[in-house]
A protein has these predicted regions:
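Soluble acyl-CoA-dependent acyltransferase catalytic core bearing the H(X)4D motif
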Residues: 2-27, 36-389, 396, 400-401, ...
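Conserved donor-binding loop and adjoining core beta-sheet/short helix segment
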Residues: 30
Length: 451
């Protein structure tokens, strides 16, 4: 029996001699991956643009230096007879398996770069070694080099992965600090809060999601990807104008973008799965999964910005500030019998439950550099999966720039990205906000093939 206390004073899991126990969500992810070995259980990856072109040997040497500095990067899944699986750091890696080159075709364009990133994001990450990879996407014609980082969701959640990226490419002193992910939950569990959480989850997950016409036609040949970038301060200014958070701005923008992108097929609300951090302060220095999922009905029909924000904020309010709502949700999530745990993972990926899947990781603090080459942009790559019909969106970025990455089972992801950015700009105008002209900060990576 676990020793987690009702007031949350003790961590639910931690680093122990002989290895780190899997959190319940880690185990659900593992069970899902084992049940469906050809379906990737991946965190949204990151495509890093750089000012410079380090070669494969240079990147491998730089990564090895960081692995020696941060042995947690050598954690691998170990299963021994009679014992539950654990993460154990063995102190070394085979760098040729973890840092690999993926040459782009001759004459490669941005479309080829996106296609390669999407293809790699749909590959299963092996669990017989540390569950991450640094891929160099090289262009023989231009000499350009991009890095695609991807990892298994069995090992980390999105916030933990931000920390892993800092271990590998961030300032070494900052990476070694034990501040951990920024979104900690300090609230206390109470009997009343647990009852409210049970009711909230039952209500939130009741009934199907509305459908979008763009997702119900014949399956597309692969997925398309798109990105939109904007200054974080602009998102904050919009949120302040409407009494909302950056996450609310993100979701309201998604609702408007989807309404312009595709018509609904029924009268049901179009819902998105939203991941919410449930990480305790005692877990700040530990990797692994510490989140819960809820559903949010997106405002596709309401025309007034105030009405749209009211609808979203009403649903996200329980999880804001020092609330213990996500910890209360996690209390119940952690108690799902293991034989049913993988169903909770698969259910959130079903179109009938949610047409959209959204995550907000926040920008990586930065600065980052790969073998001395400064990283100029970090673009989330939501994982593609054959047969998955949802729109998958991740808000991340680097430093003061937020970037939303879109993976869509249709050839129109870049259009959706443009529409999301246009929605944010429309919310600015409605609030009387005039942002400073900065084309670099408000750049949209366009998909020329979709024009």
């Amino acid at each position: 029996m676990r020793s987690d206390s009702i007031d949350g004073a003790e961590p639910l899991y931690g680093a122990y001699p002989g290895g780190r126990r899997l959190s319940p969500m880690d185990r659900y992810m593992l069970d899902f991956q084992r049940a469906y070995p050809t379906r990737p259980v991946s965190v949204s990856g990151y495509l890093l643009r750089m000012s410079g072109s380090p070669d494969l040997d240079e990147v491998r040497a730089a990564v090895l230096d960081r692995v020696r500095a941060f042995p947690v990067l050598t954690e691998r899944l170990v299963t021994r007879r009679g014992r539950a699986p654990r993460w154990e750091a063995d102190g070394e890696i085979d760098v040729t398996r973890h840092v690999r080159e993926y040459p782009l075709p001759a004459g490669a364009t941005e479309d080829d770069l996106r296609a390669t990133a999407g293809r790699l994001s749909g590959m299963v990450m092996p669990l017989d070694r540390p569950a991450w990879e640094v891929g160099l996407l090289t262009s023989p014609d231009t000499g350009d080099v991009h890095v695609l980082f991807r990892s298994s969701h069995v090992w980390v959640d999105g916030l933990s992965q931000n920390r892993v990226l800092t271990f590998l490419f961030g300032d070494e002193a900052a990476a070694g600090a034990t501040t951990g992910p920024a979104w900690m939950r300090t609230g206390k569990l109470t009997p009343g809060g647990l009852v409210s959480a049970a009711r909230r989850q039952a209500t939130t997950w009741a009934g199907p999601s509305g459908a979008l016409a763009a997702l119900t036609g014949p399956a597309a040949d692969g997925h398309s990807m798109g990105w939109a970038s904007i200054e974080v301060d602009r998102l904050r200014a919009v949120g302040q104008a409407y009494g909302a958070s950056v996450n609310d701005v993100y979701l309201v923008g998604m609702g408007g973008a989807l309404a312009a992108w595709s018509s609904p097929l029924d009268q049901l609300p179009v819902r998105t799965v939203l991941s919410v951090s449930a990480r305790r302060p005692a877990e700040r220095s530990i990797l692994g999964n510490a989140f819960v999922a809820t559903r949010v009905a997106l405002p596709l029909e309401l025309t007034s910005p105030g009405e749209r924000f009211e609808q979203v904020c009403r649903q996200t309010a329980p999880y804001k500030g020092g609330s213990s709502a996500s910890l209360s949700d996690r209390f119940w999530s952690d108690r799902v019998p293991s034989r049913f745990g993988r169903r909770t993972i698969g259910g959130g990926q079903e179109l009938r439950k949610a047409a959209v899947n959204t995550t907000n990781l926040g920008p990586i603090p930065g600065p980052l550099a790969v073998a001395g080459a400064p990283v100029t942009a970090a673009m989330p790559v939501p994982p593609a999966r054959e047969g998955r019909r949802q729109v998958v969106v991740t808000l991340g970025g680097l430093g003061r720039t937020a970037t939303a990455g879109f993976t869509v089972p249709a050839p129109r992801a870049a259009e959706l990205a443009r529409l999301w950015l246009a929605e944010i700009e429309g919310l600015e105008r409605a609030a009387g906000i005039v942002p400073a002209a900065d084309q670099a900060a408000a750049a949209l990576v366009a998909d020329s093939a979709s024009r």
